């Protein structure tokens, strides 16, 4: 079963409660926590290759875009949308390159995920299973009851 392509989320568009402790500085580009109720979708680690397992991009922003498109495709198969994502863990092979590329990564994010920012962590790793991969992202989504 193939689902229609999901549209990016609008600002503040989430069926879940964003958790922000009183007095904490507002995070930029992520949430400190999310509360959700419904059917859970677990998206295994996605990397920046296309549906034929071919890398079309060899730079981090390009691979992030493809990785996020892959996540949206998996979500769509479960009738989930970007705004249903409650948490993501990013694994990057070069945190300095990640920091240098934030502007381009932000554009890739908005093109695929919109203005929905779930709870997230970014972890630098020494390598990923696929030698060409520069990023791998796991996601969890909750589709409301």
Briefly describe each language-model feature range:
Residues 1-86, 92-145:
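N-terminal presequence-like segments and the immediate start of the first folded domain
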């Amino acid at each position: 079963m193939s689902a229609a392509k999901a549209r990016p989320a609008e600002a503040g568009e989430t069926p879940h409660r964003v958790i922000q402790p009183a007095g904490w500085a507002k995070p930029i580009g992520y949430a400190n926590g999310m509360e959700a109720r419904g059917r859970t979708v677990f998206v295994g680690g996605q990397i920046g290759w296309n549906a034929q397992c071919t890398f079309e991009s060899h730079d981090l922003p390009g691979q992030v875009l493809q990785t996020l498109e892959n996540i949206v495709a998996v979500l769509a198969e479960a009738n989930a949308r970007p705004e249903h994502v409650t948490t993501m863990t990013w694994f990057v092979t070069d945190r300095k390159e990640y920091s240098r590329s934030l502007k381009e990564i932000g554009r890739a994010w908005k093109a695929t995920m919109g203005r929905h920012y779930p709870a997230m962590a970014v972890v630098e790793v020494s390598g990923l299973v696929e030698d060409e991969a520069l990023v791998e992202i796991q996601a969890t989504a909750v589709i409301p009851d």
